[in-house]
């Protein structure tokens, strides 16, 4: 164990046995990540919780009584915060969450293990929502291939799918938040969001690793919803 340039103790993991270098580096990063440690102390399910906390503290998306949809919810960090801030724990708001993976129960959160790409997923989600939503948020990430251009297109495609769903279920004035990555492949997506929402911005919370191109697109003030049919 050694100190880094900030004076914090830095845990180093030895490579041995069947452990690959990539696994060693991932484990070492997790052990030395202050947000991972803080999440454990605070009782949150993931470090991603702090990303939503920072974004919502600044832009005030989540308010008591709201209905929120959390796409790609597992392990549940965002759903925890959303349920608390909209009052779902007390039955005043609603949080609907889906993910390909299982997710442990969270008070005030209705969860379904669903593939968002599945043809019947939007209809099932609408049934769970039972009306229109105030916020649709997505922390989904596409599987990577290692080919940069292909990965960028996959990521943008996933955000486009989430944005399309948001356009179908959001109330006028609603908000859409989605994880994306810095690239030149999202110009068309951003143009569409700017037509559909009053304000569109990119945000990079402090909890996003600085060596990552990860960022979030936040669109607020949804302009549609009045004429769209909700099945």
Swiss-Prot record:
Question: Could you name the Gene Ontology cellular component terms for this entry?
Answer: cytoplasm
Name any one Pfam family assigned in the record: FtsJ
Task: Write down the chemical reaction(s) this protein catalyses.
Answer: uridine(2552) in 23S rRNA + S-adenosyl-L-methionine = 2'-O-methyluridine(2552) in 23S rRNA + S-adenosyl-L-homocysteine + H(+)
Q: Which UniProt keywords apply?
A: Cytoplasm, Methyltransferase, rRNA processing, S-adenosyl-L-methionine, Transferase
First-tier enzyme category under EC? transferase
Q: Name one GO molecular function term.
A: rRNA (uridine-2'-O-)-methyltransferase activity
Give the EC number(s) under which this enzyme is classified.
2.1.1.166
Chain sites annotated for binding S-adenosyl-L-methionine: 76, 78, 99, 115, 139
- Name the major location: cytoplasm
Q: Which InterPro entries match?
A: RNA_methyltr_RlmE, RNA_MeTrfase_FtsJ_dom, rRNA-MeTfrase_E, SAM-dependent_MTases_sf
Q: Which domain of life is it from?
A: Bacteria
**Where, by residue number, is the active site?**
179
Q: Where in the cell is it found?
A: Cytoplasm
Function description: Specifically methylates the uridine in position 2552 of 23S rRNA at the 2'-O position of the ribose in the fully assembled 50S ribosomal subunit.
So what family is this one in?
Belongs to the class I-like SAM-binding methyltransferase superfamily. RNA methyltransferase RlmE family.
The name under which this protein is listed is: Ribosomal RNA large subunit methyltransferase E
Species source reads: Bradyrhizobium sp. (strain ORS 278)
Q: What gene is behind this protein?
A: rlmE
């Amino acid at each position: 164990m050694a100190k880094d340039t900030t004076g914090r103790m830095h845990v180093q993991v030895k490579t041995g046995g069947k452990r690959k270098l990539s696994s060693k580096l991932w484990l070492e990063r997790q052990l030395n990540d202050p947000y991972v440690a803080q999440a454990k102390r605070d009782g949150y399910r993931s470090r991603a919780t702090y990303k939503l906390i920072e974004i919502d503290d600044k832009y005030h998306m989540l308010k008591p009584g709201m209905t929120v949809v959390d796409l790609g919810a597992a392990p549940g960090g965002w759903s925890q915060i959303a349920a608390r801030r909209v009052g779902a724990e007390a039955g005043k708001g609603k949080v609907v969450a889906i993910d390909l993976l299982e997710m442990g129960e969270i008070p005030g959160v209705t969860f379904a293990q669903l593939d968002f790409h599945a043809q019947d997923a939007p209809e099932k989600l609408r049934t769970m929502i039972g009306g229109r939503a105030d916020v649709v948020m997505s922390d989904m990430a596409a599987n990577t291939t290692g080919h940069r251009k292909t990965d960028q297109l996959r990521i943008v495609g996933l955000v486009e799918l989430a944005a399309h769903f948001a356009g179908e279920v959001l109330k006028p004035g609603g908000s859409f938040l989605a994880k994306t990555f810095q690239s030149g492949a999202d110009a068309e997506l951003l143009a569409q969001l700017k037509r559909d929402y009053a304000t569109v911005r990119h945000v990079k919370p402090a909890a996003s690793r600085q060596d990552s191109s990860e960022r979030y697109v936040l669109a607020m003030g949804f302009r549609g919803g009045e004429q769209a049919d909700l099945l």
